[in-house]
Amino acid sequence: MTSLFHHVTVLLKETVDGLNIKKDGTYVDCTLGGAGHSEYLLSQLSPEGRLFAFDQDDIAIRHAQQRLERYRGQFTIIKSNFRYLKQQLALYGVHEVDGILFDLGVSSPQLDMPERGFSYQHEAPLDMRMDREQTLTAYDVVNTWPYEQLVKIFFQYGEEKFSKAIARKIEQTRKQKPIETTTELAEVIKEAIPAPARRTGGHPAKRVFQAIRIAVNDELRAFEEAIEQAIDLLKPGGRISVITFHSLEDRICKIAFKQASETPHLPPGLPIIPDEYKPKLKIITKKPIVPSEEELQHNHRARSAKLRIAEKL
């Protein structure tokens, strides 16, 4: 199992060191995955320090428990979507923390296990669920969602300029018979895109597969909800590190940090600024941190990663 779950952690030191670790602090890894960030973070803590880590994937959780065995008693793994951050931490009596991190990339093992249906490069049933107990799958999206809804998700979540043509082709194909596998879907997408456009910009199915994955797991709304909760949970001086992999996630992070770090326009002449209008955050990374050339040589999947860090005031 461990060999199956090999995951190269992106921006490892930059993300964890950016939290300004307090040895006896309480920290949250919202995206446990391969446990690389969690393992390095735990190595920085004293025996009094605590880590809470979230994941929805049973295989990732089992692997992480093995990998983090030497820190037993210092960490708690919570099987939950991070959109329930506050609610889940409250069950452990935790209402404020010293640092929180998000790594929003899909774990490489999830991409590489053909049966998970995340990848257009392996034949597999259309699944794409991060949480295997969830009922909605990629098969449902592809075969039952109406044309208009498919156009919307391909355009909004995949930034796919041929959204209408692809949705139309899917609609035509599924009338004959259901689209059941990743390779069938990839072929339908390829046929819908004009030949000249197929020669540029990577695999023609990439954007649509991303869009379907985001829709199946409601990823963007979950992150919007979680980042607001994360900012609230931080103690003064506590920090948040966020790694994003595409412009949609990065935009959500940028807006959340910007809104929390600005003072709204108030009437002139107020003697003091009321607490609820004071900025909550100071942005640490004016520009996002990106992987070094050296890291990219070892891990090509890190290419689109961006790290943003902010501190609670």
From Swiss-Prot:
It comes from the Bacteria. Its main location: cytoplasm. The keyword Signal does not apply. S-adenosyl-L-methionine binds at residues 35-37, 55, 82, 103, 110. Gene3D superfamilies: Putative methyltransferase TM0872, insert domain (1.10.150.170), Vaccinia Virus protein VP39 (3.40.50.150). InterPro entries: RsmH (IPR002903), SAM-dep_MeTrfase_MraW_recog (IPR023397), SAM-dependent_MTases_sf (IPR029063). It catalyses: cytidine(1402) in 16S rRNA + S-adenosyl-L-methionine = N(4)-methylcytidine(1402) in 16S rRNA + S-adenosyl-L-homocysteine + H(+). Its EC number is 2.1.1.199. It is found in: Cytoplasm. Specifically methylates the N4 position of cytidine in position 1402 (C1402) of 16S rRNA. HAMAP family: 16SrRNA_methyltr_H. Belongs to the methyltransferase superfamily. RsmH family. This is Ribosomal RNA small subunit methyltransferase H. The gene is rsmH.
